[in-house]
A protein has these predicted regions:
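Soluble "head" domains of membrane/secretory-pathway proteins
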Residues: 2-27, 39, 43-49, 53-232
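Hydrophobic alpha-helical membrane-embedded or membrane-associated segments
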Residues: 29-37
Length: 232
């Protein structure tokens, strides 16, 4: 009878040790998953929400895009530079980038021209190296008026050579977009990645809607037909 407490103590110790091993395994699993998520977020892909109507009808405000960071080369955190990518930005790509003067502002625009190319806009028509560039399939113009180059660069832009290491980016909603026609060329180091596919889409709530009403109205605001749309 004197051995029973000893046996019970050993069993208790074994149970305690087994529980400790399970906790340790759980910790390492959590740590591994967390590290993988961090690597994917910083170096591979993440979601980007389209904030405005400047890319209609290609994109809609409230679209959530899969942002491919790997292709152009992911930016390292803390301003440590950019890793080599799989390819370069090309004309026609949908590029997500930071405004150089305000990195907190992140936009998506279409690349029209790259380093060394000359961009000119004549009465809303875009030319690159003297050749007329066809409008993207879902681009649009909402204002039939033509503004002179002396008053605005929206519809008329004198020949502009894109500097080395820079890009000329324009919104598909040509009459309702602030882009390289206003800011000039965007440095390639400001590029975060390229938009690939619409992962989710929801129509922004009305300004006068309360938070509770917007929650109740959420299912009707989801654009189900846009989910899975590949960008072009």
């Amino acid at each position: 009878m004197g051995k029973k407490p000893v046996q019970g103590g050993r069993a208790s110790a074994r149970r305690s040790g087994g529980w400790g091993k399970k906790r340790l395994k759980g910790f390492w699993l959590w740590l591994t998953v967390s590290m993988v998520m961090v690597v994917v977020y910083f170096f591979v892909a993440t979601l980007y929400r389209v904030p405005s109507r400047a890319m209609e009808n290609t994109l809609r405000a409230g679209d959530y895009l899969l942002l491919d960071k790997l292709h152009y080369g992911p930016q390292l955190p803390f301003g440590l530079g950019t890793l080599p990518g799989l390819g370069k930005v090309e004309a026609g790509d949908l590029v997500v980038f930071q405004i150089p003067d305000d990195p907190s502002r992140v936009y998506i625009k279409r690349c029209i021209a790259t380093s060394g190319q000359v961009v000119e806009i004549i009465n809303k028509a875009t030319f690159v190296d003297g050749i007329r560039v066809a409008d993207p399939p879902y681009s649009k113009y909402i204002d039939a008026r033509i503004r002179s180059g002396s008053n605005s660069t929206r519809d008329n832009l004198s020949p502009f050579e894109v500097p080395e290491g820079s890009l000329f980016l324009i919104g598909d909603n040509r009459d309702n977009s602030r882009d390289s026609r206003n800011w000039g060329a965007i440095p390639q180091q400001s590029v975060l990645g390229r938009g690939l596919v619409v992962m989710f889409s929801v129509r922004p709530k009305e300004e006068e809607q309360s938070r509770w009403d917007s929650i109740l109205d959420f299912p009707s605001r989801v654009r189900w037909e846009r989910i899975g749309t590949w960008l072009q």
